[in-house]
Each structure stands twice: as C-alpha cells, then as structure tokens.
Amino acid sequence: SFRFFEEIIMRLATLLGLSVLHLALCVLTCTAHHPGLEKSRVSYENMGDEENAEERSCVHERETCSKVRGPLCCRGECICPIYGDCFCYGS
C-alpha cells in the first residue's frame, strides 16, 4: 500500500512540474507576441547631451515612435500599448 501512495505522489509531482513549465511557456509566448506588456526603454540614441538634441532623429510627444524599426526614437519614452501604434510620452 505504501507503493501505491508513492506512485500517486510521483504522478502529482510530475503533473505539477509540467503545469509550471506550461505556465512559464505561456507567459514567455504572450510577452513575445505583445511587447507592449513591457514598458519600453528610452532608445540608446536618446542617451546624450541636450545640446545635440535637435540633431538626433527623434520625434516629439504624442507622435508615433518605434523601438525596432529605423530612427523613430523619442526624446522621452516610447510607450507601446498592447493594441495600436507606439507613441512618445514625455520629453
């Protein structure tokens, strides 16, 4: 009878482990498909002195920005909602 309980405990532990792995995979997949779930960071191009701000190809507040494509960075933060285009916030 002890063997029976041991087998049940092993099956439950395996099921629990697989459930945790499945949940982690779902979270990673969701984050990959919806990058707006993570607050975007200021582009490296923005990390400079204020003197040359006009020379950088950055857009202004409430204009569309992009973290991935081209030079469309923000002077503030590029916020990407789950649905719709990314937009600049702040300056």
From Swiss-Prot:
Residues 1-32 form the signal peptide. GO terms for cellular component: extracellular region. Keywords: Antimicrobial, Disulfide bond, Ion channel impairing toxin, Secreted, Signal, Toxin. Its main location: secreted. GO terms for molecular function: ion channel regulator activity; toxin activity. Contains 4 disulfide bonds. It comes from the Eukaryota. Residues 33-56 form a propeptide. Expressed by the venom gland. It is found in: Secreted. Putative ion channel inhibitor that may also act as a antimicrobial peptide. This is U1-theraphotoxin-Agm2a. It comes from Acanthoscurria gomesiana (Tarantula spider).
